Amino acid sequence: MDGRQVVRARRWCATAAVALMTASTVAACGSDSGEIVISYYTPANEAATFTAVAQRCNAELGGRFRIEQRSLPREADAQRLQLARRLTGNDRSLDVMALDVVWTAEFAEAGWALPLSEDPAGLAEADATTNTLPGPLETAKWNGELYAAPITTNTQLLWYRADLMDEPPATWDEMLSEAARLHAQGGPSWIAVQGKQYEGLVVWFNTLLESAGGQVLSDDGQRVTLTDTPEHRAATVKALEIIKAVATAPGADPSITQTDENTARLALEQGRAALEVNWPYVLPSLLENAIKGGVGFLPLNENPALRGSINDVGTFAPTDEQFDLALNASKEVFGFARYPGVRPDEPARVTLGGLNLAVASTTRHKAEAFEAVRCLRNEENQRLTSIEGGLPAVRTSLYDDPQFQAKYPQYEIIRDQLINAAVRPATPVYQAMSTRMSATLAPISQIDPERTADELAEQVQQAIDGKGLIP
């Protein structure tokens, strides 16, 4: 998302927070009047956004039922655990769930999420598949059937110091060459990545693997495909070679084995990295910190026209004119581009993130829950979620909307990458598999591509078979 989005989101969410507190206050008594209340569980991080969208739907529903946002923890693992406990405990108050895109298979296989084909109105499948980007839609499927409908999505981009290079690198080989050139000149030479033992490392590996022509599992999620054919093995080894090369390159970040999204963002802002792969929030973060004087190569704090753009709580809250001024100034030293590819002249297949809406199998109000999902992700609410809330849209048509385009300077890249996206392996045991993969990949500086390829295949197979202890 761009800086103007974040600004609008902050202004808007301050108002929406009042609505959120109101919703929490009435939660205990909502059903006492006999009205139907559809619970809507979402991550706490975006509670204000999803509360405001729910209230818009309530205004449209005319009192037939009410959607009530309820917050899950901020961390994905804790969200999953809370939902799993509620579902295994047959919590009948659980209706609509915002699921991380990697949970679809697990929740479907466990019988926790209803297939969209069970919508009594018969509208859920058509709504999910119409005007929805193919990448996000793929994450909502298990065994060829839809169990959820996408509501938000995300994709990583390449961020780079435009004042240090003529053009952004198009491949990882070019990334390494550019970093080597900068190191030889004594300039910033880090490639900022997500290299510590966690899910972000699995995302990086999966993007490289799919971009090299490989994949972790077969499409049905039953067979490990990391080393099963010479072509697949070559793709796995190539992905591992890139990770190892980035970690051990001359002038590389000495703490690269402990890096995540936040350290990557700061490495570029603080002038130590010249190249970074990360999510779209990088741009608004850079502009805000530059206004505060924290970005040495972009001293926006020295521009008198930008005075007053930091509000009383210390966040970037510019006028539209101030935002345009800051954005245009940043273009002289900072840029964004497509995520670097593995093969020359072939675009990367970037692993996507986001949330899907699923109806819980424990719901007592199936028809209303499916109707709530349709309303929460309709085009107007997608516009609000994206432009005001700062969460990338899944509705294809919004990317052709001039208002949307004005708020997302990266919209073309985001759209193109979402159309040709990589998804993380679809399997009910994804959590165990991901944990094993990150443990095998770490520390990335010690990867032996051929040996690590075999170890990865073995660990993924053990996860599929449900054998052994998770590292």
UniProtKB/Swiss-Prot annotation:
Biotechnology: The reported experimental results of this protein may help in designing antitubercular drugs and/or diagnostic tools.
Matches recorded under Gene3D superfamilies: Periplasmic binding protein-like II (3.40.190.10)
Annotated effect of mutating residue 100 to A: Structurally unstable
Residues making up the signal peptide according to the UniProt record: 1-28
Summary of the function given for this chain in its UniProt record: Part of the ABC transporter complex LpqY-SugA-SugB-SugC, which is highly specific for uptake of trehalose. Involved in the recycling of extracellular trehalose released from trehalose-containing molecules synthesized by M.thermoresistibile. Trehalose uptake is essential for virulence.
CDD domains, alphabetized: PBP2_TMBP (cd14750)
Outcome following mutation: residue 279 to A: Loss of trehalose-binding
Subunit structure: Monomer. The complex is composed of two ATP-binding proteins (SugC), two transmembrane proteins (SugA and SugB) and a solute-binding protein (LpqY).
Entry similarity comment: Belongs to the bacterial solute-binding protein 1 family.
Residue positions binding alpha,alpha-trehalose: 45-46, 79, 100, 154, 198, 279, 281, 354, 424
SUPFAM superfamilies according to UniProt: Periplasmic binding protein-like II
PROSITE patterns the record matches: PROKAR_LIPOPROTEIN
Protein name per UniProt: Trehalose-binding lipoprotein LpqY
Broad class of where this protein is predominantly found: membrane
Molecular function as annotated in GO: trehalose transmembrane transporter activity
This protein's UniProt keywords: Cell inner membrane, Cell membrane, Disulfide bond, Lipoprotein, Membrane, Palmitate, Signal, Sugar transport, Transport
GO CC annotation: ATP-binding cassette (ABC) transporter complex; periplasmic space
Native species: Mycolicibacterium thermoresistibile (strain ATCC 19527 / DSM 44167 / CIP 105390 / JCM 6362 / NCTC 10409 / 316) (Mycobacterium thermoresistibile)
